[in-house]
Amino acid sequence: MANSLIDEMRNGNSNAIVAGLLHHGAIYRMNAIAFSSLQRRSNKEIVEKIKALRTDHFGIDGYSVSDFAIAALDILGIEKYTGTNQNIKRLIDCRFNFMA
C-alpha cells in the first residue's frame, strides 16, 4: 500500500500529493514535493503545504525535506532561492528530472 501512494503521486493524483506532503515519512514528503514540482502543481493548498515544509530537516541520503521544499518553491516561481546551500542549488539545476 505504501508504494501505491508514491505511484499515485507519480501518476498526478492531487489527493495523493497532498497526502504525501502530510505523511509522517520523510521519503513521502520528499516525493510529494518533487512530483508537485515536476507536474507544475502550484495551487494554493499544495504551495502552502510545501511552504510549511521549508523547516523540515528530516531527510535521506544527505538531502532534507527542507532542501526539496525550498528548491520546489524556486522551480515553481513562488520564492526565488538566493542562498548558497549546494544541495538546494543542485535540485534547482536538475529541476527534479531524476524523478521523471
What are these regions (language model features)?
Residues 24-25, 57-62, 93-96:
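Short inter-helical turns and helix N-cap capping residues of alpha-solenoid HEAT/ARM repeat scaffolds
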